[in-house]
């Protein structure tokens, strides 16, 4: 594939130890050579070497910067094109000047994600691997980065390719049946093979979909809402979990008048913590807005932490809150265990039934470990770090897998009902195409452009 040569700054803008300008394309080395002065021309250096020299403005012959230049020849590069990386001192002025020179002498400013897009278009990675690159960049826990790295290395892709190959084998058998309809034994054998392999494919798709919830948590974070009536210790809990003081903690009920969000790594599980305003009837218009936002956050939550006060009796307000959350994934936290007891724990247990209950003192930082373990076990059922690393974490992949499961089931139902094989073939072919969309074998140009537009510039 013959593409023009692109350039961009690949390091964050601002002062820093180094800055990198990256070029990729057929003219990458030639353009860099026009700006570089060193011991030998970049055109003549060995691939995958770093070369010391200077960037010169050819028009004025002025030395712009002292640099180290990496030359990487196709096809053994990320994009499978020639790549040049100019390493200079960090700083906005110099790196921008080098970037401008590369564009003056023939390169085009890269679009967001264009390097990764070229890696996909040139066959180095498939679409699911390309999407995993962004997941890796955005990872908020070690676990999430390992899951993304497994996908970059092709673990999910290999699974999808195996299922597509199995479908092709079924389709080949179906073709024999269509070509020789007069042989009953061929039809019987075809139906037997089709049902056996199709059910195996459906089982494998279901296994992948079973990881979807956990995978999305790894990718996007577990949306966790802390809820309770005012002044039960919700903000103190947030602060203990994030070990920060973003949420204001006072003795005045209703201090948190908005939803506050923080990401935190809880035993390998990324939590997107949302501390809400206390949900209660209020005449304060500002607090009322916060209460409405709290209700909205509750409706979107993956997990709810329902906080009660050990120092107060159970109230109608507590019961109303429980009614709102009783059908959700929730953990009940009895806080302020360091104070005098006024809460009847048996009454609480009767109300919440099988819902997990943890006793804490946020002031003395007691019970935090038990809470973290309960959160982990509720969604991952044990040690997150020691579980298998293959998850489906992307909403697009999950949607396509569900479609593929439906169409393979249609093929199974049709075969069992004695529908003609050429009709069954349609469902099988559609399943093969849907699975291909996951890895980009049958994705539209519009979808590809949309996915890569979400990447950062320089990646």
UniProtKB/Swiss-Prot annotation:
Its EC number is 3.6.-.-. The keyword Membrane does not apply. Binds 1 potassium ion per subunit. GO terms for cellular component: cytosol. Keywords: Cytoplasm, GTP-binding, Hydrolase, Magnesium, Metal-binding, Nucleotide-binding, Potassium, tRNA processing. It comes from the Bacteria. Mg(2+) binds at residues 235, 256. Residues 221-380 form the TrmE-type G domain. The keyword Cytoplasm applies. Its cofactor is K(+). Its main location: cytoplasm. It holds the Pfam family MnmE_helical. (6S)-5-formyl-5,6,7,8-tetrahydrofolate binds at residues 22, 85, 124, 459. GO terms for biological process: tRNA methylation; tRNA wobble uridine modification. GO terms for molecular function: GTP binding; GTPase activity; metal ion binding. It is found in: Cytoplasm. It is an enzyme of class 3 (hydrolase). K(+) binds at residues 231, 250, 252, 255. Homodimer. Heterotetramer of two MnmE and two MnmG subunits. Exhibits a very high intrinsic GTPase hydrolysis rate. Involved in the addition of a carboxymethylaminomethyl (cmnm) group at the wobble position (U34) of certain tRNAs, forming tRNA-cmnm(5)s(2)U34. Belongs to the TRAFAC class TrmE-Era-EngA-EngB-Septin-like GTPase superfamily. TrmE GTPase family. This is tRNA modification GTPase MnmE. It comes from Staphylococcus saprophyticus subsp. saprophyticus (strain ATCC 15305 / DSM 20229 / NCIMB 8711 / NCTC 7292 / S-41). The lineage of its organism: Bacteria, Bacillati, Bacillota, Bacilli, Bacillales.
């Amino acid at each position: 594939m013959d593409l023009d040569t692109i350039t961009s700054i690949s390091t964050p803008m601002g002062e820093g130890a180094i800055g990198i300008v990256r070029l990729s394309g057929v003219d990458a080395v030639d353009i860099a050579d026009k700006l570089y002065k060193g011991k030998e021309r970049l055109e003549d250096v060995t691939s995958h070497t770093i070369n010391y020299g200077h960037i010169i403005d050819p028009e004025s012959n002025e030395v712009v910067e002292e640099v180290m230049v990496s030359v990487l020849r196709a096809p053994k590069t990320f994009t499978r094109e020639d790549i040049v990386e100019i390493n200079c001192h960090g700083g906005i002025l110099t790196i921008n000047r080098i970037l401008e020179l590369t564009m003056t002498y023939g390169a085009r400013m890269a679009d967001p994600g264009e390097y990764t897009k070229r890696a996909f278009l040139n066959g180095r990675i498939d679409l699911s691997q390309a999407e995993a690159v962004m997941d890796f960049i955005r990872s908020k826990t070690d676990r999430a980065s390992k899951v993304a790295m497994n996908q970059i290395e092709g673990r999910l892709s290999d699974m999808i390719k195996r299922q597509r190959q199995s479908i092709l084998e079924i389709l080949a058998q179906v073709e024999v049946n269509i070509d020789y309809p007069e042989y009953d034994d061929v039809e019987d054998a075809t139906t037997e093979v089709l049902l056996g392999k199709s059910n195996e494919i459906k089982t494998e798709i279901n296994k992948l979909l079973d990881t979807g919830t956990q995978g999305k948590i790894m990718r996007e974070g577990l949306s966790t809402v802390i809820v309770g009536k005012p002044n039960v210790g919700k903000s103190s809990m947030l602060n203990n979990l994030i070990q920060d003081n973003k949420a204001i903690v006072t003795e005045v009920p209703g201090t948190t008048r908005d939803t506050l969000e923080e990401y935190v790594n809880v035993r390998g599980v990324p939590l997107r913590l949302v501390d809400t305003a206390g949900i209660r009837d209020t005449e304060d218009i500002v607090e009322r807005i916060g209460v409405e936002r709290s209700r909205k956050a509750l409706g979107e939550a993956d997990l709810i932490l329902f906080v009660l006060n050990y120092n107060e009796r159970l109230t109608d307000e507590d019961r109303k809150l429980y009614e709102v959350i009783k059908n959700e994934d929730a953990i009940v936290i009895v806080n302020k265990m360091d104070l005098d007891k006024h809460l009847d724990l048996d009454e609480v247990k009767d109300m919440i039934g099988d819902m997990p209950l943890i006793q804490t003192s946020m002031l003395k930082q007691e019970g935090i470990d038990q809470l973290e373990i309960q959160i982990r076990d509720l969604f991952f059922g044990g040690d997150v770090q020691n579980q298998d690393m293959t998850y489906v974490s992307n909403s697009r992949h999950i949607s396509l897998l569900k479609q593929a499961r439906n169409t393979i089931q249609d093929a199974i139902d049709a075969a069992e009902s004695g529908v003609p094989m050429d009709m069954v073939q349609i469902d099988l072919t559609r399943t093969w195409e849907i699975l291909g969309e996951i890895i980009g074998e049958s994705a539209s140009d519009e979808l590809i452009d949309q996915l890569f537009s979400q990447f950062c510039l320089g990646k």
